[in-house]
């Protein structure tokens, strides 16, 4: 629950967005491992990664099954709000979207890939796709998560 302000160097003026990869890298450098299992960063700024117009979040994905390593992810809540699109606020929907995106990115930190099942790990390229997916893992993804414990 530590706060870390964004830096000017992480901002892309041409895109009017923050570089999610730079922010996540700095967040992870500033984390003291202690007894942490995973790190979830939450930012209220518009973010991008690579050539994508925007992302709801990004994650460090383990290449090998290393349970001792600390992995993290970052989600942006900016585009999850209806107000971003000039619509009336809906706090219940905002909370549901935030939960789904947090679970999705945290799933990646446990090595889960995008899933075609009815699953929170289904890729979302729009808010409608986020709204349409459930807030839980399918049986296959749930088994993979449980194998880490």
Where are these regions (language model features)?
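The catalytic-center signature of Zn2+-dependent metalloproteases
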Residues: 85-149
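Metzincin-family zinc-dependent endopeptidase catalytic domain
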Residues: 1-101, 113
